[in-house]
Design a protein with these regions (language model features):
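Electrostatic, structured charged patches in enzyme active sites and in nucleic-acid/phosphate-binding
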Residues: 1-144
């Protein structure tokens, strides 16, 4: 994942649900998705890191707040509207880490994976309770 950071300036600020003057992207992948959301006429509104979802960390057993990358409301081909929560992650962080010689790295990757799984479980539950969808998009989904 490319770690380009900055402030996104939307062409269509009225589509943004939040402060359109402070839309932060934390990677070139997020920037790419923001451009797509801003330009796509089927996107009714979108937001970035605006919704906190509580989850219990498997690392410290404390409740934390997860801010998903995007919340999107789109108009489908059938005319119905759908709300989705989207998370952008490298595919490597969506799979159980494989033990390697570097134990410290394996421990860190395992912790990241465990925390991500719990965040995504909480987001999926939140979405099901609200009639929304939850998706994790990787570089393959983004065509990178």
């Amino acid at each position: 994942m490319s770690y380009k950071k900055g402030i996104f300036n939307p062409k269509n600020p009225k589509k943004y649900n939040g402060n359109a003057e402070n839309i932060v992207y934390r990677s070139s992948w997020e920037f790419r998705v923001m451009k797509w959301l801003d330009d796509n006429p089927k996107v009714i509104w979108w937001a970035s890191e605006e919704l906190p979802i509580p989850y219990k960390s498997p690392i410290d057993q404390q409740v934390h707040r997860y801010f998903p990358d995007f919340i999107v409301r789109i108009k489908r081909k059938d005319g119905q509207e759908t709300t989705m929560i989207l998370e952008i992650k490298p595919e490597s962080q969506t799979k159980q880490p494989v033990r390697r010689r570097k134990t410290a790295r394996f421990i860190q990757e395992s912790a990241t994976y465990a925390v991500n799984q719990e965040k995504w479980r909480a987001a999926d539950l939140f979405c099901r309770e609200h009639g929304w969808q939850f998706k994790v998009l990787t570089e393959k989904d983004l065509g990178i």
